[in-house]
Amino acid sequence: MAGKPAATQSRSHFASAYCALALAVSLAGCAGLPDQRLANEALKRGDTATAQQNYQQLADLGYSEAQVGLADIQVGTRDPAQIKQAEATYRAAADTSPRAQARLGRLLVAKPGATEAEHHEAEGLLKKAFANGEGNTLIPLAMLYLQYPHSFPNVNAQQQISKWQAAGYPEAGLAQVLLYRTQDTYDQHLDDVERICKAALNTTDICYVELATVYQKQAAPEKQAELLKQMEAGYSRGTVTAQRVDSVARVLGDATLGTPDEKTAQALLEKIAPGYPASWVSLAQLLYDFPELGDVDQMMKYLDNGRAADQPRAELLLGKLYYEGKWVPADAKAAEAHFEKAVGREVAADYYLGQIYRRGYLGKVYPQRALDHLLTAARNGQNSADFAIAQLFSQGKGTKPDPLNAYVFSQLAKAQDTPEAVELATQLEAPLTPEQRAQGQRLVQQELATRGTLAQSSLQLHALDEEEDGEESL
């Protein structure tokens, strides 16, 4: 399973320093310095095209930090090919750029299937970047220790985090929150999360998201209202980013965290969406989850605005509407077209394309296409994809049934612990011989090794993407 099985068997804080450096490049370097502010501001509001254009102008003049800015955008696409390019860019700049050291370290922490050598390289880079004054290094370092304890047998993550806390490092508290999330003890430590994040709120705006989560889980509307008031004031002053406001709004609209406050979420998103296009899609998702907030015309307006800003989540959600046929008439061809535009940037796009091809929604079953997309989705962390692959191999629609591969993917799907997955795994295991089961378990382990050992937590992705201040970039 390491390879794909066949279907029948897939502003300028650095301005003065840069002007001095520009003497060795060209006077145009100083003339181009305002572009760094344009790039930073564009990136903060989600306008990656403008950011990329301005970073490119500086990168062409030889500015390593601008090259790192371009790599940041590549990482943000979630496209494996672009992430590979970003890794090479970070690595080339790491000798002279502490920021590149931190970025490369974080990228290696989040890299699926990273080698033990890469784990230790990440540790060294993050420690070096921390010593050079870079922020957002202890959180990914904590994730490294938590995610790959076998690579660091002499490191106790909790003890290390406690040492950081005793030393007074600002990131240490959030590293503790990360430990709670990773070890699934977050709900047992809500009071501690609140204490940590209230203390860090003025310097670390991701704490707005954590506190909003805590107050939703605690059903504490008074505390939540005070937090939102403080956040909106910070947003007006420019100390809280639109990305954070968007994230908090999505917490408010998440019914799995407690009683949702969808109307407040909608009001927050509508305030920031004109300057932060990703929020148009968050608004559409909110309307999808709470249809009473609007109608299909409102939904299409939100999605059109998101698509105009090249937001892949907009293509994904529009594809879902045509796939499900709830808001608009079902149209598998239209769904396919929108999902294809989101492929490489939204993992779920591969999942839905795989389901279209597996279920024959285009008039017939396309088993190899289905497998290719579903396997990509599964390897990128889409929870339901393994179950769909097990169904593909066991049902034999459009292809010959393959009991061994069906068993392998049913075992992988069983990790999701849903009744359907457990039932299918039990059903597919029964007719196999002991030898076949042993072979299947070897293939399961091989596939797990291909994917990496753990799914990425939301906080880990923050650790990869998070920038303390958009102005820091250059």
PLM regions: where:
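Bacterial N-terminal signal peptides
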Residues: Y18-A28
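Bacterial signal peptide processing site
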Residues: A31-L33
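Post-signal-peptide N-terminal segment of Sec-exported extracytoplasmic proteins
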Residues: R37-A88, R99, N136, P140
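Structural signature of tandem alpha-helical TPR/SEL1-like repeats
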Residues: G46-T50, R78-T89, A114-L125, P149-Q159, ...
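Short helix-capping/linker turns of helical repeat alpha-solenoids
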Residues: L61-Y63, T77, T96-P98, K111-P112, ...
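Hydrophobic face of amphipathic alpha-helices that form TPR/SEL1-like repeat modules
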Residues: G69-G76, G105-K111, L141-Q147, L178-T182, ...
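Alpha-helical adaptor scaffolds
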Residues: K320, E324, E340, G344-Q382
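Terminal, low-structured helical/coil segments at or just beyond the last alpha-helical repeat
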Residues: P419-L474
